[in-house]
């Protein structure tokens, strides 16, 4: 589940170098970014800082290039992670948990670094807009399949109720089967569950699992799985 961004001095420097490579000159950057509007003209690349609450946020081109840079940095990080595995002798396919319509990264670029696309799906079933929820979840399946034009995996789905949605409802009988088959119907090759055994503690100790704190195999959820 890659995400987040860093605004430290090292990342600021890397961002400026990325901009230099893209635009070559500060004059060209000013022209492409239309910085003359509202007197945002830069005199050098060293004056540019990432958009943040304590900096500039009104230049659309700055915001867009920053997001592109964050994707570039993340993809480069994934590339080096995989390289380390390959150097260690692993030939297994690689993947990463993608997340819904996550706006922090360009998943089409991230998908180029991994062998198999997989994503975490946690739809909020059993609300008034259940049909819209099904449409939305199906659209995400289609998006994930389109990232590489190949079948994908549903990496995470909750077999019962989550611990973090505003109202975390237990799935009705048959709902887990329907949700899993929706992934297969949209081009998926597998539907996996998080988690197999409920955590003993920490943030997700009340997150649903195939085997709950009771520990038995005679629960409805276990039988549904």
Tell me what each language-model feature is.
Residues 1-139:
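Polysaccharide-binding and catalytic clefts of secreted carbohydrate-active enzymes
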Residues 41-51, 91, 111-115, 122-225:
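Carbohydrate-binding surfaces of carbohydrate-active enzymes
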């Amino acid at each position: 589940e890659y995400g987040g961004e860093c605004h430290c001095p090292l990342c600021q420097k890397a961002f400026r170098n990325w901009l230099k490579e893209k635009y070559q000159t500060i004059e060209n950057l000013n022209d492409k970014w239309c910085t003359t509007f509202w007197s945002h003209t830069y005199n050098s690349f060293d004056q540019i800082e990432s958009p943040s609450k304590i900096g500039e946020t009104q230049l659309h081109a700055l915001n867009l290039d920053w997001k592109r840079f964050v994707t570039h940095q993340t993809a480069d990080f994934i590339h080096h992670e995989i390289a380390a595995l390959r150097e260690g002798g692993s030939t297994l396919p690689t993947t990463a948990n993608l997340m819904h319509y996550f706006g922090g990264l360009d998943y089409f670029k991230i998908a180029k670094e991994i062998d198999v696309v997989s994503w975490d799906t946690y739809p909020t079933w059993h609300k008034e807009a259940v049909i819209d929820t099904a449409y939305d979840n199906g659209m995400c399946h289609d998006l994930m399949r389109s990232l590489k034009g190949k079948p994908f995996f549903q990496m995470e789905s909750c077999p019962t109720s989550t611990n973090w949605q505003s109202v975390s409802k237990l799935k009705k009988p048959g709902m887990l089967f329907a949700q899993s088959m929706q992934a297969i119907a949209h081009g998926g090759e597998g539907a996996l569950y998080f988690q197999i055994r409920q955590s003993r503690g920490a943030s997700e100790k009340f997150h649903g699992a195939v085997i709950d704190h009771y520990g038995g195999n005679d629960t409805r959820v276990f039988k549904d799985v």
